[in-house]
Amino acid sequence: MKSKLIAAVILAIIIAAFAASRFISFKQQKPVETVAPKPQVTIGIILPLSGREGAVGKGLQAAARLAIDDLPKHRLKNEYNFIFKDDEFEPKNTIAAFTRLQHADRANAVITYSAQSGSVINTLAENGKIIQFNVGSAEPAVAKGRYNFVHWTHPDESTREILDHFRRNGFQKVAVITPKISEALAAENAFRQNLPRYPEITAKYYRAKPQEKDFRMLLSFIRNYEPDVILALVSTSRASDIIFQYRASKLPYPLTNVASFGRLDTFAGGEDMFFSDVAPARQELIKRMLSSQPDISTFGAGNIYDAVMLLVEAFEDAPSPQQAVGALEAQRYYEGMAGRAEQDAEGVFHAPSVLKQIKNGRAEIEK
């Protein structure tokens, strides 16, 4: 009987000790810290990944992916989701891609390529309060409105570059060919505004239809004018046409261009021609792109890389994603893969311009 009593007392002591230890352990246990989820920011990137501008679009996509890979994700306050869309360089597809990004993906911003794409969604972006950051457009109207921005070489820089070339070579009479399209007219307007700085140079202007493919008649008129040099402000889609028709005409005056020759898939027929172009990306970015894809286009690579970085920086600096447009507006200068760019009052980040010459089938920067 006594042994049973002792056993019961020992069991009670053990149970009490176990309960006390559990209570103390519970009291000492730290509360579980809950980490608030990061705000979500979605950025759509609409590019021509197929179609006639597909080669350029794939190069831009590769540069954008490198920018995304380079983001210091562990230090960012927002969670970023990047969505690529192929518009095949067709305006209706650009609108459809933007609409899906706006309503299905709830995009906070989009990156677009070219004046064509930037123009067709300019109003949609403005009304939807979605930031559009365009690369590849020299048309100032693409940046119209508070929510529209451009990162590219402005016609003011590119036309001064070509005028400097004319001066160095003693070209005093210039024949300017301008199709009636907004981007070409903007380049001509910049050329006219810069011309007074070069009093020794005069120009005569020749208009072409918006989608003109046959420039032979204009070239015959130019032969009668006998200029020192021809400046063709044609679009990329018509650049090959005028190059081959110029060669066939055997005109003795050099053919030059602003920007569009740089977008050609091939420089066949353009040997020795000069053109001003957007400055290339820094060598470190170009080397990374070419290391995995030796034949990839690097056209505009620095611009789209910097557009990704500028957008992320704006969203990081803003108190909320909805206020990122104000942070982007406040960015006056940016030193990036495209060099030093300055933002003007219209939302255009002016990238540098360079002079290039076609040599051995490649466009090389003229030193």
Predicted regions mapped to residue ranges:
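Extracytosolic ligand-binding ectodomains
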Residues: 2-367
